[in-house]
């Protein structure tokens, strides 16, 4: 009941153009979450919690729209804002 789109990069993107430019299948530095969509409450969090331990990256970062909803979602789910860019926000999730 949830969908997430990811890309693997060695640089944190701040735009969708940079995401396309930096994406490499064999990158290990960052997993970038750029779409999280759920069909019910709690499923976005569930899919992120399920995927994080499986992705084998050093860091887990979002490329998020500049919306209050994105800020609320990521902060509520334990992420820290690490980038306030012209077109996007970046949040980082840390495995505990």
For every predicted segment, state its role.
Residues 87-96:
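C-terminal "cap" of GNAT-fold acetyltransferases
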Residues 16-78, 83-84:
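Acyl-donor binding region in acyl/amide transferases
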């Amino acid at each position: 009941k949830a969908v997430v789109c990811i890309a693997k990069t060695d640089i944190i993107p701040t735009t969708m153009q940079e995401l396309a430019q930096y994406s490499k299948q064999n990158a290990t530095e960052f997993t970038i979450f750029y779409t999280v969509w759920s069909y019910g409450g709690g499923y976005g969090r569930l899919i992120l919690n399920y995927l994080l331990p499986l992705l084998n990256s050093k860091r887990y970062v979002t490329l998020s729209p500049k919306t209050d909803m994105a800020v609320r979602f990521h902060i509520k789910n334990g992420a820290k804002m690490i980038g306030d860019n012209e077109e996007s926000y970046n949040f980082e999730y840390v495995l505990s």
